[in-house]
Regions:
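Short, small-residue-biased leader/transition segments that mark boundaries at the very start
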Residues: 2-3
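Short beta-strand to alpha-helix junction loop
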Residues: 38, 125-136, 178-199, 359-367
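A glycine-rich dinucleotide-binding beta-alpha-beta segment and adjacent secondary-structure elements
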Residues: 148-160, 164, 380-441
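Helical element adjacent to the flavin cofactor pocket in flavoenzyme catalytic cores
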Residues: 174-224
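Mid-domain catalytic core of redox enzymes
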Residues: 185, 215-329
Length: 471
């Protein structure tokens, strides 16, 4: 029964792909749009190999604008396709054509590290450590001295938990390049990806179980023996692949000599990204016109989120509209995401969902009002359309996705110390492997690639890459 059991601690499968119901409405947890899904592009190729591409209900976002940026009383559009992206921004920055050309070439070169051509040649990814050691903000500044353009190019940094003096150009480029290739929304919620994958796993003889929280990883004679589930049941296994945060994985391990204290303290010392406060607005019928692009609002001259400076405020947010059902021209759910560190909700650290008390409810109400006020500054007067409001905080992320500190993206990759935040898929303990958003890059693309790197430890990289590339 090797590699055949998958355990999920929650009722719902899928981590950030979870879609939950509130009052007849679907809410997505984390994946609001996905890139590189056009024919021949990398996510399309992976999903085709997994056998799920033709089963997904997706909607291609607008080519002319898939991300709209509000910055300093002006509006800038990210258009799909590298050329179109460049031409569109040239309307606003006519003297920056050559610099935009250089920027596009730079992010493309990072995106090309994981092309389908590499897969066909038997390589999952080309080595990109140089880009991990390059600052995202620094790279943008080296391309253009125009402050406004620098900020417009960094305006979607919420997607990777952007921190100005830490974020790597690798993450910035990998994620932005993916959306420039093609950007899609899920029409029936992002959880369909998890559900389709589960069908495939089961069809291939695997077992996927929910409400099975791993509470201990068993080790004997410096080798994995299996896991304990919900503090009671023992499941024996030869291998364990953990997609938990490495800090959590290490805390579950039985005592052993293979994993050195120095490694444990390095992992413990790593900083985690900020979390997200999400405001889900359930809209009245036929009231809020659907827009087939995301909106990023920035209230400050500097678009990067700063922990100390912005604590308790809303300096920026992302707005994502749910694709309407049927032929309706109106959206039923609008999600608004804004950065928030765990510090802001630390008072309620020891509580569980639905039992956090009145003060927590009040905190969420005040934050909601602050965000709605922020939206009104940009002309989004939606109060008359709102039927109901549902919110989540970093605590919700912690309790439903098991992240440390309620972090949205896990371990912060710091370009100044790329090796320190780099975690390998293989551990020093025999038959324990790691995967998930804390290794390499987070997000649908990053996690897929990391899963492949983990699997290649079992079947070999060349074999696996060619299987995917020729799917």
């Amino acid at each position: 029964d090797v590699y055949k059991r998958q355990l999920e601690k929650n009722e719902l499968f899928g981590g950030c792909f979870q879609t939950y119901q509130r009052g007849g409405h679907r809410m997505d947890t984390g994946i609001h749009y996905i890139g590189s899904l056009d024919e021949g592009q990398i996510m399309n190729q992976y999903f085709r190999y997994f056998g799920i591409m033709d089963k997904l209900s997706i909607k291609r976002m607008d080519e002319e604008v898939f991300d709209r940026i509000y910055y300093k009383d002006a509006i800038y559009d990210y258009a799909m396709g590298h050329e179109r992206f460049m031409e569109t921004l040239c309307h606003s920055f006519p003297h920056e054509r050559e610099n935009l050309k250089r920027y596009v070439a730079a992010i493309r070169s990072v995106g090309n590290l994981i092309s389908t051509d590499h897969l066909k040649k038997g390589r999952l990814s080309q080595e990109g450590m140089d880009f991990f050691a390059t600052s995202a903000a620094g790279m943008i500044a080296s391309v253009t001295t125009n402050r406004d353009l620098q900020n417009v190019l960094a305006a979607t940094s919420l997607l990777y938990g952007g921190i100005k003096n830490k974020s790597t150009f690798y993450e910035h480029a990998m994620i932005n390049n993916s959306y420039l290739e093609s950007a899609y929304r899920f029409t029936e919620g992002s959880m369909q990806v998890s559900l389709e994958l589960i069908h495939i796993i089961r069809a291939n003889g695997g077992t996927v179980l929910n409400r099975k929280e791993v509470t201990r990883i068993l080790v004997k004679d410096e080798a994995i023996q299996g896991v304990e589930v919900n503090h009671e049941e023992i499941l024996e296994s030869t291998y364990v692949i953990s997609n938990l945060h490495p800090q959590l994985t290490l805390s579950l391990l039985d005592k052993n000599h293979s994993i050195k204290p120095a490694f444990v303290s390095r992992i413990k010392s790593l900083e985690n990204s900020y979390g997200i406060f999400t405001l889900n607005l359930m809209m009245k019928k036929d009231c809020c016109p659907y827009q087939n692009h995301n909106i990023y609002l920035h209230g400050n001259e500097d678009v990067w989120y700063e922990k100390e400076m912005h604590k308790g405020n809303t300096p920026s947010c992302m707005i994502s509209m749910q694709v309407p059902r049927g032929n309706s021209k109106f959206t039923e759910v609008v999600s608004i995401l804004t950065p928030m560190y765990m510090d802001e909700v630390s008072k309620w650290t020891d509580t569980t969902p639905e039992h956090r008390g009145e003060a927590y409810r009040q905190f969420k109400e005040e934050k909601t009002e602050q965000i709605l006020q922020f939206l009104r500054r940009f002309g989004f007067h939606w109060n008359h359309c709102i039927e109901k409001i549902h919110t989540t905080t970093p605590l919700s992320y912690r309790d439903y996705t098991g992240t440390i500190d309620g972090s949205a993206y896990g371990i912060v990759k710091n370009y100044q110390y790329p090796q320190i935040s780099f975690v390998s898929t293989r551990t020093k303990l025999k038959n324990l492997f790691l995967t998930g958003q804390n290794l390499n890059v987070h997000g649908a693309l990053g996690v897929t690639l990391t899963a492949m790197l983990t699997c290649s430890e079992f079947v070999g990289q060349e074999y696996l890459a060619k299987k995917v590339g020729n799917a």
